[in-house]
Swiss-Prot record:
Keywords, sorted A to Z: Membrane, Photosynthesis, Photosystem II, Thylakoid
Binding partners and assembly: Part of the photosystem II complex.
NCBIfam families for the chain: PS_II_psb28
InterPro entries given in the database record: Psb28_c1_sf, PSII_Psb28_class-1
Family according to the record: Belongs to the Psb28 family.
Name under which the protein is recorded: Photosystem II reaction center Psb28 protein
Coiled coil: none
Lineage of source species: Bacteria, Bacillati, Cyanobacteriota, Cyanophyceae, Oscillatoriophycideae
GO biological process: one example: photosynthesis
Subcellular location, record wording: Cellular thylakoid membrane
Length: 111
């Protein structure tokens, strides 16, 4: 049950592109998520974006660094950044991503 939400209770169906960076020492890292045409922007949705919530069997990882991208005044995409400040946070994120990838038929590729 690995899922991503931008508003509590509204599961995001759009599959993101994710870019990972990690410090040379492994002490910190970032994950940049890009969601094109997320369902939070669907016409029938009235909830506002309150953050990015990565939810799985271990609990929840939260990022408040979420930005909307607009084209011609209409919402088009969401970019969210998750900052990991310790090796434990990195490992926790990777466990979430393994579950999310497995449930959504995704795979990891190095750039």
């Amino acid at each position: 049950m690995a899922q991503i939400q931008f508003a509590r209770g509204l599961v995001e169906d759009a599959i993101p592109t994710i870019r990972l960076t990690r410090s040379r020492t492994g002490d910190s890292g970032t994950a940049t998520f890009y969601f094109e045409s997320p369902n939070i922007f669907a016409d029938e949705q009235t909830q506002e974006v309150t953050g990015m919530y990565l939810i799985d069997s271990e609990g929840e990882i939260v990022s408040r660094e979420v930005k909307g991208k607009f084209i011609n005044g209409k919402p088009h995409a969401i970019e969210a950044i998750l900052i990991m400040n310790s090796p434990d946070e990195w490992e926790r994120f990777m466990r979430f991503m393994e579950r999310y990838a497995q449930e959504h038929g995704l795979e990891f590729t190095k750039a």
